[in-house]
């Protein structure tokens, strides 16, 4: 199966909850900015044809040693994704958050393969916590729920049409594959049994450092 695709790497978030002077994706993890951990992992994948980094101009110098395109971030995450999509030249696109430093080749391959069958796919983990809705308060069946991560892979035109529809509806998307859902496409979920870290708080960075420094599994 031909898995050729583009990568849109999101690096435009402000990260207010991280309590840092710089956006969390540029905070160092074991001597290297978080976002570069993800970039290096994707650049080792031969089927990734191009990389589009969505970031503020002041951070572009960090990526100059690499063969990447640039796009400017928007107000919402979906605006940033749409901005990056304008630089994509392949029929398939993979989206990855710059604050998710751990990327596993087998999972990217599985997500991209699954997307070819339905038009959209996302990496997921089973819900392990008890989750309640707030209004009204009631317990949800966690066996019917999943926690969604990146990578997420979509048909480029499906994503474009879904993002445009969301904009026309003034609808805020929770993730990228929800753009496909708006078009009536049911995304495929690829379940992972690994720890999936999204660095949101300073404690997340400490956890990531521990994993990266002490376990060869995450290197």
Swiss-Prot record:
Q: Which Pfam families match?
A: IspD (PF01128)
What this protein catalyses is: 2-C-methyl-D-erythritol 4-phosphate + CTP + H(+) = 4-CDP-2-C-methyl-D-erythritol + diphosphate
Disulfides per UniProt: none
Answer whether the UniProt record assigns the keyword Transferase to this protein.
Answer: yes
Q: Does the keyword Transcription regulation apply?
A: no
Q: In which pathway does it act?
A: Isoprenoid biosynthesis; isopentenyl diphosphate biosynthesis via DXP pathway; isopentenyl diphosphate from 1-deoxy-D-xylulose 5-phosphate: step 2/6
Tell me one GO biological process term. Answer: isopentenyl diphosphate biosynthetic process, methylerythritol 4-phosphate pathway
Keyword terms of this UniProt record? Isoprene biosynthesis, Nucleotidyltransferase, Transferase
Broad enzyme group: transferase
**EC number, as in UniProt:** 2.7.7.60
Q: Which residues cross the membrane?
A: none
Q: Where is this site: Transition state stabilizer?
A: 17, 24
Q: Which InterPro entries match?
A: IspD, IspD/TarI, IspD/TarI_cytidylyltransf_bact, ISPD_synthase_CS, Nucleotide-diphossugar_trans
**Which PANTHER family does the record match to this protein?**
2-C-METHYL-D-ERYTHRITOL 4-PHOSPHATE CYTIDYLYLTRANSFERASE, CHLOROPLASTIC
Q: NCBIfam families of this UniProt entry? A: ispD
The family this protein is said to belong to: Belongs to the IspD/TarI cytidylyltransferase family. IspD subfamily.
* Biological role: Catalyzes the formation of 4-diphosphocytidyl-2-C-methyl-D-erythritol from CTP and 2-C-methyl-D-erythritol 4-phosphate (MEP).
**What HAMAP family does the database record attribute to this sequence?**
IspD (MF_00108)
Protein name per its UniProtKB record = 2-C-methyl-D-erythritol 4-phosphate cytidylyltransferase
Give the species: Chlamydia trachomatis serovar D (strain ATCC VR-885 / DSM 19411 / UW-3/Cx)
């Amino acid at each position: 199966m031909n898995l050729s695709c583009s990568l849109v790497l999101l690096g435009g978030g402000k990260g207010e909850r991280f309590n840092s002077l710089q956006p969390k994706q540029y905070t160092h993890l074991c001597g290297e900015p978080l976002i570069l951990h993800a970039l290096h992992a994707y650049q080792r994948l031969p089927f990734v044809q191009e990389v589009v980094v969505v970031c503020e101009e002041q951070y572009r110098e960090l990526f100059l040693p690499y063969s990447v395109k640039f796009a400017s971030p928007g107000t919402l995450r979906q605006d940033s994704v749409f901005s990056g999509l304008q630089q994509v030249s392949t029929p398939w696109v993979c989206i990855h958050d710059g604050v998710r430093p751990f990327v596993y080749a087998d999972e990217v391959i599985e997500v991209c393969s699954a997307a070819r069958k339905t038009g959209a796919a996302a990496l997921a983990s089973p819900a392990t916590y008890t989750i309640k809705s707030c209004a009204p308060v009631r317990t949800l069946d966690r066996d019917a729920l999943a926690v969604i991560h990146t990578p997420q892979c979509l048909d480029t035109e499906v994503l474009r049409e879904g993002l445009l529809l969301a904009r026309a509806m003034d609808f805020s998307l929770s993730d990228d594959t929800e753009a496909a859902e708006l078009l009536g496409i049911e995304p495929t979920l690829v379940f992972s049994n690994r720890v999936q870290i999204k660095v949101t708080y300073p404690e997340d960075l400490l956890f990531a450092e521990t994993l990266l420094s002490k376990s060869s599994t995450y290197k």
